[in-house]
Amino acid sequence: MTTRIDLRGLLPQELEELAVRLGEAPYRGRQIFRWLHARRAKGIEVMSDLPRAFRERLALVAELPPVRVLNRLVAADGLTRKLLLGLGDGNSIECVLMIYKDGRRRNTACLSSQVGCAMGCSFCATGQGGLQRNLTASEIILQALALGAELAEGEGGNRISNIVFMGMGEPLNNYEAVMKGVRIFEDPSGWGISHRRITLSTCGIVPGIERLAREKPPLELAVSLHAVTNELRDKLMPINRRYPLEELIPACRRYAEITGRRVTFEYALIAGVNDRREDARGLSRLLRDMLAFVNIIPLNPVAGSGFKGVPPAAARAFVALLQEAGLEAAIRDSRGQDIAAACGQLRFASREVL
């Protein structure tokens, strides 16, 4: 049995090539792209400006797998929602929608890049189940479609304004599919999301950061740091044993210099572990004279980790120390803790729900 092509994961030029192979003019491919990513078509049969005969030929070789929402959780504030999505092979992934009703009216989609994660960070739930596989570009797009459908008309329609690759998985270990997704999201004839509104978060894959610096894809870079010494970072984030700070920080500096874009460093404050004054001073020294911003993250509870967060006053004091040293820093708004949708809490919930 021949596997049909999943249209959502194709770039405009790939859809144009498909149209030509099926005996149509290239512009038909761009029409298909608009149906998929501007009109959010759920089936080939609704693409009414395509000739019926072409739609019939297309349906023989291509498909649009349905969005399968297995579970849906809404935070008490109603503004954070977590979806468990079923994939065609029986695996499942989680993604999160965060609605901000401030002056900028942002609707942020937090997307997964892998089923599970191989990084094994000690304070993160995702890695507890290990890595199953990479997601395809289509499966990445599917998450945004599902989250966009969550938005009511009064909340900006189904317009996703921001994309963050901060869900399950390490995006730089699924580089090709993630970058393909980014290019689809950025295309003005579809989602039309500016590169300033697409953020990729990595635990510190140095070759991937160097590739980002060379290729300059349309996105912003965030790096999960969480410690200022190799000794501590080795314990918190095993990837540091492969790419220690003396390799990671210079790679980030080069990225900032080459692209002209600042690097955001994420730092989860863990009580009694990385929250001392000397940690703040070490962080200031590490990032001195770099185009950088520090996001201080309130640690979110993860069963079995043994870690605890710090009181809000302590987090504010830590930020003040960084700012006094000349670093740009702020406390990141943490959303969705009550539905395990916050940073570090996504996992194989399907084992608990189904």
From Swiss-Prot:
UniProt keyword terms in alphabetical order: 4Fe-4S, Cytoplasm, Disulfide bond, Iron, Iron-sulfur, Metal-binding, Methyltransferase, rRNA processing, S-adenosyl-L-methionine, Transferase, tRNA processing
- Molecular-function GO terms, alphabetical: 4 iron, 4 sulfur cluster binding; metal ion binding; rRNA (adenine(2503)-C2-)-methyltransferase activity; rRNA binding; tRNA (adenine(37)-C2)-methyltransferase activity; tRNA binding
* Statement: the UniProt record of this protein carries the keyword 4Fe-4S: yes
Q: What does this protein do?
A: Specifically methylates position 2 of adenine 2503 in 23S rRNA and position 2 of adenine 37 in tRNAs.
Give the UniProt subcellular location, in the record's own words: Cytoplasm
Q: What is this protein called?
A: Probable dual-specificity RNA methyltransferase RlmN
The record's free-text note on cofactor binding: Binds 1 [4Fe-4S] cluster. The cluster is coordinated with 3 cysteines and an exchangeable S-adenosyl-L-methionine.
Checking PROSITE patterns in the record gives:
RADICAL_SAM
